């Protein structure tokens, strides 16, 4: 990693979620040279308790000169280098909620040399001090943000160093090939001939491994970030019934009256480990009702923001010109499925579109028939169908860099096909090695690190 200026200040932040009436315990974390002194200044530790590293102390946080007890706390001291950041770290475990936590944090921030931590700054210091590699730090952030068990499992694989080990192994293979090439450039007459075909084959194998990691990362992105699926259709085709069926609760009001849903309803569910936000839109039709028109406008917005659109139509009526008009309004860039609802009362000639082809999915939102097929189709269409063999998942930054490395190796292959000298091979090979080094943090600058860690939560 390139040399980066280190901030000598001590930082402090709440490391746990803070919400009114939620959480019995909160943790305030400090890291830096003044961490121990700052906490000693604001606490009273009774008896003969010793401020030794990796010991838990009991006491109280006091309010300034008055000596008023703000809270009863436990203090955990972790001296450098045996801490998360590699610096002196002190954690104050106080009662949760909002007021007590704010008062304790304010007392800490009043101490000389202590400032409020920036988002992700604790993790950034851990990386700078060699306590974490960058991929593990990013995986910790993903673990905190995980919205499903499968996403948490993938994040934990990164925390355990899986991504770092895989990328480092691929990078080492490229470094081996680069050393062979450079040796031939400098000392070709003194060395045996290089097997260019074997070298090219090795580069292709590494490129294939990188492309697989990129593909797996796309599936992992759906597991981490979730998908937005919009339910769209004419009034009274069963959108709200399907929302309630998939949500396993009465999220939307269901009646036989068209136009019942007048606003955009959202419901969070998990399908096969993938977090899904279902968007139940207002039925799109011509109407003079001002409130309903607002809901219809939001339905159009939902079409553009969705990862997938489920266009519902009524199998008991068949495909209508209004259904076709709705299909034409779906943006070309947004995938969609035609879902025929009310299969239990379908007319014999119901069809999915003007072409006469069958609906992608036929189901009954009231009985649940066809639900499993719908779930499978949703995940397949969004590229989010993952089997148990998915062990590692690159995030967006890592995936982009892996793709850059794969593209550089493809250019190297073209150089070889053009019959250019060895030194031309090394240009793109060096770029691939550099891109992989950026994934693990070996090739990074301060500005890039700042951008990465600014996306982390405060206190992490």
Curated annotation (Swiss-Prot):
Q: According to the lineage, what is the superkingdom?
A: Bacteria
Q: Does the keyword ATP-binding apply?
A: no
The molecular function terms of the Gene Ontology recorded here are:
GTP binding; GTPase activity; metal ion binding
Where is it found, in Gene Ontology cellular component terms? cytosol
Keywords linked to the UniProt accession: Cytoplasm, GTP-binding, Hydrolase, Magnesium, Metal-binding, Nucleotide-binding, Potassium, tRNA processing
Q: Where does Mg(2+) bind?
A: 240, 261
Which is an annotated Pfam family here? MMR_HSR1
Query: What does this protein's record comment on cofactor binding?
Result: Binds 1 potassium ion per subunit.
> Where is (6S)-5-formyl-5,6,7,8-tetrahydrofolate annotated to bind?
29, 91, 131, 460
Give the binding site residues for K(+). Answer: 236, 255, 257, 260
Q: Tell me where in or outside the cell this protein is found.
A: Cytoplasm
Instruction: Report residues binding GTP.
Output: 236-241, 255-261, 280-283
Q: What class of enzyme is it?
A: hydrolase
Q: Which GO terms are recorded in the biological process aspect for this UniProt protein?
A: tRNA methylation; tRNA wobble uridine modification
- What residue ranges carry the coiled-coil annotation? none
EC numbers, comma separated: 3.6.-.-
Which InterPro entries does this one have? G_TrmE, GTP-bd, GTP-bd_TrmE_N, GTPase_MnmE, MnmE_dom2, MnmE_helical, P-loop_NTPase, Small_GTP-bd
Q: Where is the TrmE-type G domain?
A: 226-383
Specify whether Chaperone is a keyword of the entry. no
Required co-factor? K(+)
Give the protein family. Answer: Belongs to the TRAFAC class TrmE-Era-EngA-EngB-Septin-like GTPase superfamily. TrmE GTPase family.
Question: Quaternary structure?
Answer: Homodimer. Heterotetramer of two MnmE and two MnmG subunits.
Question: What is the role of the protein in this entry?
Answer: Exhibits a very high intrinsic GTPase hydrolysis rate. Involved in the addition of a carboxymethylaminomethyl (cmnm) group at the wobble position (U34) of certain tRNAs, forming tRNA-cmnm(5)s(2)U34.
> What protein name is recorded for this chain?
tRNA modification GTPase MnmE
């Amino acid at each position: 990693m390139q040399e980066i200026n280190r901030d000598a200040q001590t930082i402090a932040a709440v490391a746990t979620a803070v919400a009114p009436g939620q959480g019995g315990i909160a943790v305030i974390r400090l890291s830096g040279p003044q961490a121990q002194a700052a906490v000693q200044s604001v606490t009273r530790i009774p008896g003969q308790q010793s401020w030794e590293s990796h010991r838990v102390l009991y006491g109280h946080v006091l309010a300034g000169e008055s000596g008023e007890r703000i809270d009863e706390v436990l203090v955990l001291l972790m001296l450098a280098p045996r801490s998360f950041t590699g610096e002196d770290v002190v954690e104050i475990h106080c009662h949760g909620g909002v007021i007590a936590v704010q008062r304790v944090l304010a007392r800490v921030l009043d101490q000389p040399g202590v400032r409020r931590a920036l988002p992700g700054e604790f993790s950034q210091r851990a990386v700078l001090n060699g306590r974490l590699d960058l991929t593990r730090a990013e995986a910790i952030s993903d673990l905190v943000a995980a919205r499903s068990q499968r996403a948490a499992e993938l994040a934990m694989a990164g925390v355990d160093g899986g991504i770092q080990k895989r990328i480092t192994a691929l990078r080492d293979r490229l470094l081996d090939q680069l050393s062979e090439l450079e040796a031939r450039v400098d000392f070709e007459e003194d060395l045996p001939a290089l097997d260019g075909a074997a070298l090219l084959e090795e580069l292709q194998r590494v490129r294939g491994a990188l492309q697989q990691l990129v593909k797996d990362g796309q599936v992992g992105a759906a597991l981490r970030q979730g998908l937005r699926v919009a339910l769209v259709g004419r009034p009274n085709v069963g959108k709200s019934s399907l929302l309630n069926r998939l949500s396993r609760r009465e999220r939307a009001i269901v009646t036989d009256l068209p136009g019942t849903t007048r606003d955009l309803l959202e419901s969070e569910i998990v399908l096969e480990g993938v977090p899904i936000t279902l968007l139940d839109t207002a039925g799109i039709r011509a109407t003079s009702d001002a409130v309903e028109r607002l809901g219809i406008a939001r339905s159009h917005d939902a079409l553009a923001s969705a990862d997938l659109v489920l266009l519902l139509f009524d199998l008991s009526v068949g495909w209508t010109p209004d259904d076709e008009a709705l299909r034409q309004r779906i943006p070309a860039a947004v995938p969609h499925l035609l879902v025929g609802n009310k299969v239990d009362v379908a007319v014999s000639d119901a069809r999915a579109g003007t072409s006469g082809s069958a609906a992608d999915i036929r189901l009954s939102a009231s009985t649940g028939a066809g639900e499993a097929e719908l779930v499978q189709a949703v995940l397949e269409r969004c590229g989010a169908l993952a089997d148990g063999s998915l062990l590692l998942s690159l995030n967006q930054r890592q995936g982009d860099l892996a793709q850059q490395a794969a593209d550089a190796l493809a250019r190297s292959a073209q150089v070889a096909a053009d019959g250019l000298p060895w030194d031309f091979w090394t240009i793109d090979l060096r770029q691939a090695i550099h891109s992989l080094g950026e994934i693990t943090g070996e090739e990074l600058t301060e500005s890039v690190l700042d951008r990465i860690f600014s996306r982390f939560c405060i206190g992490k």
